[in-house]
């Protein structure tokens, strides 16, 4: 996504690192670049607002559950694959079969 306007920091870079900004996982100097970008780019600001709302909703609904570290690492790895344009292996996308599901013979 791009608004088509030139910016000091490109829209694609902002969107690629949006969750790092939302989660406060980036240096202050980078945060300043993001804030400046949002001041001049309404499409990115809108996307930021939407993702911020989703994050708050998830926290409110699921905030009491601890996420295992290995699950977080796996999800972040998959997000990195997606952001880099690589495809996620099909076996990682499909739901694992339930133990109560009937077995085919």
UniProtKB/Swiss-Prot annotation:
Gene knockout outcome: Viable, but defective in sporulation, white color. Strong induction of disulfide reductase (trxB) and thioredoxin-2 (trxC) that is not further induced by diamide. Acts as a SigR constitutive mutant. A double sigR-rsrA mutant sporulates normally but is more sensitive to diamide.
Q: Where is this region: Contributes to redox-sensitivity?
A: 33-47
PTM: Under oxidizing conditions up to 3 disulfide bonds are formed. A single disulfide bond inhibits binding to SigR. Cys-11 forms a disulfide bond with either Cys-44 (the major bind) or Cys-41 (a minor bond).
Compositional bias annotation for Low complexity: 94-105
Transcription regulation recorded as keyword: yes
Pfam families in the record: zf-HC2 (PF13490)
Where in the chain are disulfide-linked cysteines found?
A: 11-44
Cofactor stoichiometry and binding remark: Binds 1 Zn(2+) per subunit. Zinc is not required for SigR-binding, but is required for anti-sigma factor activity. Zinc-binding renders RsrA relatively resistant to oxidation.
The reported effect of residue 45 to A is: Wild-type inhibition of SigR, more induction by diamide
Q: Which UniProt keywords apply?
A: Disulfide bond, Metal-binding, Redox-active center, Sporulation, Transcription, Transcription regulation, Zinc
List of residues binding Zn(2+)? 11, 37, 41, 44
Q: Which cofactor does it need?
A: Zn(2+)
Q: Which InterPro entries match?
A: Anit_sigma_mycothiol_RsrA, Znf_put
What domain of life does the native source organism fall in? Bacteria
The observed outcome of changing residue 46 to A is: Wild-type inhibition of SigR, more induction by diamide
Q: Region Disordered: what ranges? A: 86-105
> Family assignment?
Belongs to the zinc-associated anti-sigma factor (ZAS) superfamily.
Q: What does this protein do?
A: A redox-regulated anti-sigma factor for extracytoplasmic function (ECF) sigma factor SigR, and a key sensor of disulfide stress. Holds SigR, its cognate ECF sigma factor, in an inactive form, inhibiting its sigma activity under reducing but not oxidizing conditions; oxidation and reduction of the anti-sigma factor is reversible. Mycothiol (MSH) is competent for reduction of RsrA, allowing it to bind to SigR. In conjunction with its cognate sigma factor SigR may sense the intracellular level of reduced MSH. Probably releases SigR during oxidative stress.
Q: How does it assemble?
A: Interacts with cognate sigma factor SigR under reducing but not oxiding conditions. Treatment with the thiol-oxidzing agent diamide inhibits the interaction, while incubation with thioredoxin (trxA) stimulates the interaction.
Q: What is this protein called?
A: Anti-sigma factor RsrA
């Amino acid at each position: 996504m791009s608004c088509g306007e030139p910016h000091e920091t490109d829209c694609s870079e902002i969107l690629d690192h949006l969750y790092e900004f939302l989660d406060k996982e980036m240096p202050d100097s980078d945060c300043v670049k993001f804030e400046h970008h949002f001041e001049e780019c309404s499409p990115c600001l809108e996307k930021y607002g939407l993702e911020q709302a989703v994050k708050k909703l998830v926290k409110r609904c699921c905030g009491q559950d601890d996420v295992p570290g290995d699950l977080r690492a796996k999800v972040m790895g998959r997000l990195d694959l997606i952001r880099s344009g690589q495809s996620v292996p099909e076996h990682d996308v499909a739901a694992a079969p339930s133990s109560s599901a009937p077995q085919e013979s």
